[in-house]
């Protein structure tokens, strides 16, 4: 394995004296390096847009989204996946994050897991992957065997495949139908890809999941109308969203929220259309979940 050609493994010329910097110097240089990350992501927007479009189309056909990765890359996939459940009110199976080595690898490194190119296919088989699904392989280096094996298995079934790497001309790009490459350059701490590379990956994953959820009607204007009120904060937010979407007062929001069985989206449609719950729910069904399509012009 030759790591010398990977920019994520190169030494950063700006931080050769990192161990002798003052805290102010360290914080300043790290902040400056981090500012380059969104610009790198911006250079890949066209490919990211293609990926969002693909995920959205598969969601509309009942497909699922799987993130696969090892180490930090895998953890970021799991993080994005689990947040989709309360944010967009989806079932946990719709977006899943798989990490090399299984759940225990979220907190402890599992030796050899990322180098096993058969492990991801086994993980995906357990989830009954089909051609209707999408697999996003995440690897900062762009050469992780676990990810490559998973992408190849997905492709063999006819599933959509997307890769996300932080090096140009990466190996995993050759194994995906849509290849996202966000080269962030050398880290301030050589080879520590949890830094700029991890930040870039998180930014892209945010775009993939959020963009696709917008595309299937999980958002009204810029409000998360399918949020699940699973705690006190989200309960308060749910009522606030109803007020913001309909310009109603808090008392009305609270009343209709309960009538709608604490379904934010349904409550909004009931208020905007002045329909009772059953009819409002039917309007939402006909509109494929898009609130904007239920409102008379």
UniProtKB/Swiss-Prot annotation:
SUPFAM superfamilies listed in its UniProt record: SIS domain
Domain SIS: 55-218
Top-level division of the source organism's lineage: Bacteria
EC assignment: 4.2.1.126
Pathway the protein contributes to: Amino-sugar metabolism; N-acetylmuramate degradation
GO biological-process terms attached to the record: amino sugar catabolic process; N-acetylmuramic acid catabolic process; peptidoglycan turnover
Swiss-Prot/TrEMBL keywords: Carbohydrate metabolism, Lyase
Catalytic activity: N-acetyl-D-muramate 6-phosphate + H2O = N-acetyl-D-glucosamine 6-phosphate + (R)-lactate
EC class name: lyase
Pfam families assigned: GKRP_SIS_N
Signal sequence annotation: none
Active site (record annotation): 83 (proton donor), 114
UniProt entry tagged with the keyword Lyase: yes
Note: A lyase-type mechanism (elimination/hydration) is suggested for the cleavage of the lactyl ether bond of MurNAc 6-phosphate, with the formation of an alpha,beta-unsaturated aldehyde intermediate with (E)-stereochemistry, followed by the syn addition of water to give product.
Protein name: N-acetylmuramic acid 6-phosphate etherase
Gene assigned in the entry: murQ
């Amino acid at each position: 394995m030759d790591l010398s050609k990977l920019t994520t493994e190169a030494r950063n010329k700006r931080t050769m004296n990192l161990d002798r910097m003052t805290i102010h110097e360290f914080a300043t240089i790290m902040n400056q390096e981090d500012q380059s990350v969104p610009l790198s992501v911006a250079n890949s927007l066209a490919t990211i847009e293609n990926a969002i479009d693909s995920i959205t189309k598969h969601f509309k056909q009942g497909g699922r989204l799987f993130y696969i990765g090892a180490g930090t890359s895998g953890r970021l996939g799991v993080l994005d996946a689990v947040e989709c459940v309360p944010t967009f009110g989806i079932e946990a199976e719709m977006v899943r994050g798989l990490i090399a080595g299984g759940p225990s690898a979220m907190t402890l490194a599992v030796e050899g897991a990322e180098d096993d190119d058969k492990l991801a296919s086994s993980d995906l088989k357990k989830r009954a992957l089909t051609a209707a699904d999408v697999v996003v392989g995440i690897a900062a280096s762009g050469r992780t065997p676990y990810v490559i094996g998973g992408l190849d298995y997905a492709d063999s079934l006819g599933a959509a495949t997307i890769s996300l790497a932080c090096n140009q001309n990466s190996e995993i790009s050759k194994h995906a139908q849509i290849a996202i490459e966000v080269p962030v350059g050398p880290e301030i701490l050589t080879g520590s890809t949890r830094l700029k590379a991890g930040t870039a990956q998180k930014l892209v994953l945010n775009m993939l999941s959020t963009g696709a959820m917008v595309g299937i009607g999980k958002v009204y204007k810029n409000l998360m109308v399918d949020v699940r009120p699973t705690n006190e904060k989200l309960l308060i937010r749910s009522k606030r969203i109803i007020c913001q979407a309909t310009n109603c007062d808090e008392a009305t929001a609270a009343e209709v929220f309960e009538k709608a069985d604490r379904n934010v989206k349904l409550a909004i449609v009931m208020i905007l259309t002045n329909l009772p719950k059953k009819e409002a729910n039917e309007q939402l069904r006909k509109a494929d979940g898009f609130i904007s399509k239920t409102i008379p012009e």
